[in-house]
Amino acid sequence: MANRSKSYVIIILIIILLVLGLVFLGTGCTGDENYKGSVPAKKTSSEITGSQEIFLKGSDTVLPLAQAEAEEFTNENPGKSVSVTGGGSGVGITALIDGEVDIATASREMKPEELEAAKVNGINPVEHTIAYDGISVIVNPQNPVSELTFGQLRGIYNGSISNWKEVGGEDRPIVTISRDSSSGTYEFFKEEVLLGDEYRPDALTQPATGGILLEVSQNPNAVGYIGVAYLDESVKALNLDAGNGSVAPSSENITSGAYPLSRALYFYTNGEPSGLTKEFIDFVMSEKGQNLISEVGYFPVQ
């Protein structure tokens, strides 16, 4: 009798274990059905943090403009955030390709290799021209030189001209200051002025426009180049002659195209913008946004 009771207990325990096993097995199967096995698509910062915040990164030339637009936009739209940082056009474009920002700001067009990298990453860059700008060649106010031809400027930056007396100045060595290679201004200057030549190897590079301003303002022998919007009384802007006479970097000459170092400024988005990104770009392109571009020292597109 005792043996029969033990048998019943064992059978009951086996049944319980089987039932529990089926329950756990069913739970596991349900989890497998819910997991599709695909890697989630890379999201932009705004998709991760919510649609009330967007991130811009890139050109130091575009930085003051973008900051002013962001401040005005957020003042008019409480609860919405627009974060703007610099670092250079190349840095911003890389961030867009990597899905880290909503807008890349740039003072040059994207390169073919950047477009290819974007395609590989599933990013579809769309270009938006938001303003125009000019590049000023600057010297220390103590420097008597007031203008340069493009040939002279090319010689200074490729190293074939190394003394200010060679361009009508005093007998002093020329100290050339340049942006680093991540800068769109660096690329534009190389294409338009150096025409394929390399920068002289002893050129001092700066990661930001402010560094060029500081160096030139403190060194009577220095020469540099910056966006017109950054000009202040600590430096002197030179007139440039590209073959049609000496031209100053004035607003009239830049907007008319007479000044030889004029260029467009860009926003790049992943595909056609939507949501808060579209709202912000629409604001920048509105009458109020374009008026603000003029106030900051740039030149509107409309």
Language-model segment annotations:
Residues 2-14, 18-302:
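Exported/periplasmic ABC-transporter solute-binding proteins
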